[in-house]
């Protein structure tokens, strides 16, 4: 696959949604140790609903992928009114802004989406790299994708590079001191443990990868 067409966008995100449904219990168990225990529910409900939302919004978007993502992200936010839900929907909307007017996603466009997504999460969550959050997997993914795309990599190569960087980002959180939420209160328990938010970010990239490289 060298590009993703407008009509394929719901299926692209169905790949993400299906993965989060599969990983729901795993994420909830991880989150129960150092968070609220609802991470898997939020991600599976939000991304699980996204393909149908996109199909409903497709006519109004009139072939504009950016518009479709912005409208769908807005609707998704009302379905998952939680901190992570708002971060995800904001990321999708910001990623959509970067693709405004696009009718297909090639390697540079995918990079623009990932960069916009990470920027949206950072803006909404007011987080920085190294604070043990989802940002620690999605920012390296976007940066690696950008580097690969600028070097002329294909769509599949770009998402593969992004996935590898996200995985490395997750691994790096084992040595980070948490700043937010319950994890910050129980910081000692986090040592040597992957951040569950970063894992969720990795799964987001993995879901995209599974579709693009199938």
Task: Tell where the protein language model's regions lie, with residue ranges.
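N-terminal loops that bind phosphate or other acidic moieties
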Residues: 1-214
